[in-house]
Swiss-Prot record:
Organism encoding this protein: Arabidopsis thaliana (Mouse-ear cress)
Family named by the database record: Belongs to the eIF-3 subunit C family.
InterPro entries assigned: EIF3C, EIF3C_N_dom, PCI_dom, WH-like_DNA-bd_sf, WH_DNA-bd_sf
One GO BP: formation of cytoplasmic translation initiation complex
PCI domain ranges (all copies): 604-776
Protein biosynthesis found in the keyword field: yes
Protein name: Eukaryotic translation initiation factor 3 subunit C
Gene assigned in the entry: TIF3C1
């Protein structure tokens, strides 16, 4: 038939009949306008009856079409196409057998195998034709030879029967198909009646398409099939029949073209008709595995509704294990094939393959990934967090089960997951979660499960034995103590290390700095953390950050700076804390590295506030560096406590115009400039204007502590700067200048004298400080310089040896602990005894490196004019303070996995 274009033009070369047909079609198109309701195609075809084919017929048609394509390929000797169609027909066979529930393959498939086998033998016999084949065709022929030989072994008996009597086998096939597909016929009848039943008036105002009704019937087909299975005679549904169906479904898992949700539904239906508790348990394990496969990618997460079903399935597994104590879950020994056929009243042990710990860890991982992917500023994120008690209830029940079974190693792994869900929560958040868990009702989840399972009930009914709600002690500390004690007794090395870090983190969160510090020093985790996995290194970094915040809240400025200094040494805070991806101008990351780093990110509710962390670090550095720079004004670069702070200060001083402070750095730099001039009031006002203080619950007491420390360091800075200008200085005058009580001034100055930071003495009758002039010989100055250089060389050699030996061997770290040069590497008690107790011994007889540095600096001061007491007086103690900061907390570089 010609085109309408020529019809509209009115070509005289066409037949008259064709012209009339085309004109009629054009007229019909004009009448049946698609924008008119009465002109719809569904109403126009009143004489055509819609035919709905059952799924079985559709699958057979697909297989028949593929077989026809194979015949065409045989005619042209195309083995490449033949190989592709052979793989295709094998996949279609699985679908056909699944739908028809037949034991034997259809005759069409056996006939195809016989045809292929004969054709292959002919092709192999014709060697001349084989030589003329192309390379791809020859490879496909050889591949087809192997595939067909392997495949035909599975159907040897059927092939032999067909070769003996092909006509008889073809006659038997329709009868078998009719017997196997009674259920499909009934569903087809229902579909036909639903389509033929409702008639629609073409002139009606509302035109409801019959496709919607058909779609509703198709949706209910699954439920009807299940109902048919449940209404079958129980004698027909045997353990063997269910086991065979179970193996067929499991065999299809992971294959291309298999719908994952459909696979989960099929396995879920099998749990309803399982004949024994062990069989139901075995199928439930496969259901959970299939649910994990719903989202196979690494970037996404399991759908939330599937996650909840997975948790409910695991609780059902625990119900079965608790009720039937003779059933044992084990993944080390392959159970017998007929193990699950043993009845309910069987007294012996029944082994079922499974791993509850692995499943729980996967559930926890999927929950973690969902929080990573959901936008934290939406309601959905908050709703997702409300599911956490559901996971904690599951973990608690699994841990109780393992403890009853005596498997304490597995119980320790489960306890670690519970610890990692609690350690970062303050007591207020813990109380809110505990109240939420008490208010959560189980009816919602139970109703959802009933709706999905449909009206039929299971053959094996398992009551809810294990509780669906978690139980929490009133104090989060009490719960942590119970869990970590179990882990310390029974966990492996990695589990113990992570539990220890979580325990330290929680102690720091609860303001127990001394306990947290002692746990860290006794565990020696800082010496071995570089050998652990990256997630544990991230946990270590988070713990050190929390420990630094705790020390700051307790007023321990030196210790706080020691914990945070390494964290801010490389400008990669976000990366080290897993709170963002850092970008470096010198190191470009591959897309794979970026994806891996994003997968390690912490969820938003677990983030540490970076502004607060930066403020604490810079304030601590300011309180330590300003007196240190005043004490070493002639050689400021020689003794550096915080390189990061010095760099920021240099950048700030190079600016021609200083704008009002905007961010945390600007505020701290402005406070530093004021403190350097001795204006402690302005320094405190600038710091007090920071917004981060509102994040602290005891804000007023912390600000009072900061103000007192600013006054103290302002006093020290003043004495370091102007001691050379005085012969004596009144105690009363110092107290009035810095608004500090006289006993406190006396204590500060006396400590500086004892530590040889200030070369002076007290005149008790007049209550004055008398400054002394110090002069050194040339030999003494050279000796002090040599001592300092030797100490630096020895320390560098120790670090080089330690990096080569991995921190062990010659016990060089213990020597550094004895010298009080490493906070985090200190031994329990001795080396890390903080500034107050360590400085006394270090000033005169302890740390030779600090002493030597002070003497050398003093001599330099003497050469430059021998100011009164200025050279020697303020050097040694500041040297000691600097040495305490070295190598402090052993933060870990995640890119290289070594200490930075």
């Amino acid at each position: 038939m010609t085109s309408r274009f020529f019809t509209q033009v009115g070509s005289e070369s066409e037949d008259e009949s064709d012209y009339e047909v085309e004109v009629n079609e054009v007229q019909n198109d004009d009448v049946n306008n698609r924008y008119l309701q009465s002109g719809s195609e569904d109403d126009d075809d009143t004489d055509t009856k819609r035919v709905v084919k059952p799924a079985k017929d559709k699958r057979f048609e697909e297989m028949t079409y593929t077989v026809d394509q194979m015949k065409n390929a045989m005619k042209i000797n195309d083995w490449v196409s033949l190989q592709e169609n052979f793989d295709k027909v094998n996949k279609q066979l699985e679908k056909v057998m699944r739908i028809t529930e037949a034991v034997k393959p259809p005759t069409l498939y056996i006939k195809t195998l016989v045809m292929l086998e004969d054709f292959l033998n002919e092709a192999l016999a014709n060697k001349e034709a084989k030589k003329k084949m192309s390379t791809s065709n020859s490879k496909a022929l050889n591949s087809m030879k192997q595939k067909l030989k392997k495949n035909n072994k599975l159907y040897e008996d059927d092939i032999n029967k067909y070769r003996e009597a092909p006509e008889v086998e073809e006659e038997k096939q329709p009868e078998d198909d009719d017997d196997d597909d009674d259920d499909d016929d009934e569903v087809e009848d229902d579909d036909d009646s639903s389509i033929d039943g409702p008639t629609v008036d073409p002139g009606s105002d509302v035109d409801e398409p019959t496709d919607n009704l058909t779609w509703e019937k198709m949706l209910s087909k699954k439920d009807k099939l299940l109902e048919k299975l449940m209404n079958k005679d129980p004698k027909e549904i045997t353990w063997d029949w269910v086991n065979k169906k179970f193996k067929e479904i499991v065999a299809a898992r992971g294959k291309k073209g298999t719908a994952r949700f459909e696979l989960v539904d099929q396995l879920t239906h099998l749990t309803k008709i399982a004949k024994t508790p062990a069989q139901k348990l075995e199928i439930l394990f496969s259901v959970i595995s299939a649910q994990f496969d719903v989202n196979p990618g690494l970037s996404g997460h399991m759908p939330i509704n599937v996650w909840k079903k997975c948790v409910l399935n695991m609780l059902t597994i625990l119900d079965i294990l608790v009720k039937y104590s003779n059933i044992v879950v084990d993944d080390t020994v392959e159970p017998d094939e007929n193990e699950t056929s043993k009845p309910t009243d069987y007294d012996g042990k029944i082994r079922v393959w499974g791993n509850l710990v692995a499943f729980l860890e996967r559930v926890d991982t999927e929950f973690f990934k969902s929080l990573q992917c959901i936008d934290p500023h939406t309601r959905e994120y908050v709703e997702r967090l409300r599911d956490e008690p559901m996971f904690l209830a599951l973990a608690q029940n699994i841990q109780d089960y393992f403890e009853r079974m005596g498997d304490f190693k597995a119980a320790a792994k489960v306890a670690l997951r519970r610890v990692e869900a609690i350690y970062y929560k303050p007591q207020e958040v813990y109380d809110a979660m505990r109240k939420l868990a008490e208010l959560v009702e189980e009816e919602e989840e139970t109703e959802e499960a009933k709706e999905e399972s449909g009206p039929p009930t299971s053959f094996i009914v398992v009551p809810e034995v294990v509780p669906r709600k978690p139980t929490f002690p009133e104090s989060s500390r009490a719960m942590m103590d119970i869990l970590v004690s179990l882990i310390y007794r029974n966990g492996d090395e990695r589990t113990k290390a992570r539990a220890m870090l979580c325990d330290i983190n929680h102690h720091a969160l609860m303001d127990n700095f001394v306990t947290a510090r002692d746990l860290l020093l006794m565990s020696h985790l800082q010496d071995n953390i570089q050998h652990m996995d990256i997630s544990t290194q991230i946990l270590f970094n988070r713990t050190m950050a929390q420990l630094g915040l705790c020390a700051f809240r307790a007023g321990m400025i030196t210790e706080s700076h020691s914990c945070l200094s390494e964290l801010y040494s490389g400008q990669r805070v976000r990366e080290l804390l897993a709170q963002g991806v850092s970008q470096s101008r010198y190191h470009e990351k591959t897309p794979e590295q970026e994806r891996m780093e994003r997968r390690r990110q912490m969820p938003y509710h677990m983030h540490l506030n970076l502004e607060l962390l930066e403020a604490v670090h810079l304030i601590c550095a300011m309180l330590l560096e300003v007196p240190n720079m005043a004490a070493n004004s002639h050689d400021a670069k020689r003794r550096v406590i915080s390189k990061n702070f010095r760099r920021l200060l240099e950048i700030s001083e190079r600016q021609a115009f200083t704008a009002p402070p905007e961010n945390v750095r600007d505020h701290v730099m402005a406070a530093t400039r004021a403190l350097t001039k001795g204006d402690f009031q302005k320094a405190f006002e600038v710091l007090n204007s920071l917004e981060v203080w509102r994040l602290l619950k005891n804000r007023d007491s912390i600000l009072d502590m900061v103000k007192d420390r600013i006054k103290e360091e302002a006093l020290r800075t003043y004495l370091f700067t102007y001691s050379s200008s005085y012969e004596s200085l009144s105690l009363d005058q110092l107290a009035k200048m810095f608004d500090v009580s006289e006993p406190q001034v006396h204590s500060i100055v006396s400590k500086m004298m004892i530590n040889e930071e200030l070369h002076a003495s007290w005149d008790q009758p007049t209550r004055c400080i008398v400054f002394h002039e110090v002069q050194h010989s040339r030999l003494q100055s050279l000796a002090f310089q040599l001592t300092e250089k030797l100490s630096i060389l020895a320390e560098s050699n120790e670090r080089a040896m330690e990096s080569r030996t991995g921190g062990g061997g010659l016990d060089l770290s213990s020597r550094r602990r004895d010298n009080n040069q490493d906070y985090a590497g200190a031994a329990s008690g001795g080396g890390g005894y903080w500034q107050d107790k360590a400085n006394y011994g270090q000033g005169r007889q302890g740390n030779r490196s600090g002493y030597g540095g002070g003497r050398s600096s003093g001599q330099n001061g003497q050469w430059s004019g021998q100011n009164r007491g200025g050279g020697y007086a303020g050097r040694v103690g500041s040297g000691n303070r600097g040495m305490q900061m070295d190598g402090s907390s052993r933060m870990v570089s995640l890119n290289r996995g070594v200490r930075t």
